[in-house]
Curated annotation (Swiss-Prot):
Keywords: Cytoplasm, DNA damage, DNA repair, Hydrolase. Belongs to the uracil-DNA glycosylase (UDG) superfamily. UNG family. The gene is ung. The active site is at residue 64. GO terms for molecular function: uracil DNA N-glycosylase activity. HAMAP family: UDG. Excises uracil residues from the DNA which can arise as a result of misincorporation of dUMP residues by DNA polymerase or due to deamination of cytosine. It is found in: Cytoplasm. It comes from Geobacillus thermodenitrificans (strain NG80-2). Its EC number is 3.2.2.27. SMART domains: UDG (SM00986), UreE_C (SM00987). One of its GO terms (biological process) is base-excision repair, AP site formation via deaminated base removal. This is Uracil-DNA glycosylase.
Length: 229
């Protein structure tokens, strides 16, 4: 699997040598060889590639990757250009519109957020096609817990957006009083009406960053139309 190239590399170097990770790597080699696994092997660590450790301002925790063809590309909630926007992301865009007035874009490609310091991290980084949660309990949780712990150690204030029970289970790892946690139900159609809509996470995130002297996030995802990415 591709090795990290930016400032995450030295921070996670030891993690890649731990017995749980070596076991996970062998499991994934066999899975990718014999089944259809998402995302592409070269996209697994995109959350870390697009958002270097030094740049992290916001952590948006997801669960596991989308399990439909062509959707997942290593960023939580994001899909590749040209792929229909999934229901949870539709609801995120609705809340963004109601919160900050951003127009609803024609795509769900969230790389713009990642490049501004929004770490779009799933707690499990791979999945079998058509089988949600199929790689749960295989070792990824240990790895992403370490990522969360490293962000928690940062001196710069960070906002953690914890949507849904799975994400909120990570709250105990966020102990640094400099950071700010915003919790809400998951944006899934099954739970969005129970408090996700109306909780204004985007304006609250920017208010906190501004108060701390950090640049706010430009949350508007632009239309890309027929243009290839």
């Amino acid at each position: 699997m591709p090795i990290l190239k930016n400032d995450w590399a030295p921070l996670l170097e030891e993690e890649f040598q731990k017995p749980y990770y070596l076991k996970l790597r062998e499991f994934l080699k066999e899975e990718y060889r014999t089944r259809t696994i998402y995302p592409d092997m070269y996209d697994i660590f995109n959350a870390l590639h697009y958002t270097p450790y030094a740049n992290v301002k916001v952590v948006l925790l997801g669960q596991d990757p989308y399990h439909g063809p062509g959707q997942a590309h290593g960023l939580s909630f994001s899909v590749k250009p040209g792929v229909p926007v999934p229901p949870s992301l539709v609801n995120i865009f609705k809340e963004l519109h109601d919160d900050l007035g951003c127009y609803i874009p024609d795509n769900g490609y969230l790389v713009k957020w990642a490049k501004q310091g929004v770490l779009l991290l799933n707690t499990v980084l791979t999945v079998r096609r058509g089988q949600a949660n199929s790689h749960r309990g295989k070792g990824w949780e240990h790895f992403t817990d370490r990522v969360i712990e490293l962000v928690n150690e940062k001196d710069d204030p960070v906002v953690f957006l914890l949507w849904g029970r799975n994400a909120q289970e990570k709250k105990e790892r966020i102990t640094n009083p400099r950071h700010h946690i915003i919790e809400a139900p998951h944006p899934s159609p099954f739970s969005a009406a129970r408090g996700f809509f109306g909780h204004r996470p985007f304006s609250r995130t920017n208010a906190f960053l501004t108060k701390c002297g950090r640049e706010p996030i430009d949350w508007q995802i632009e239309n890309i139309g027929a243009r290839a990415e």
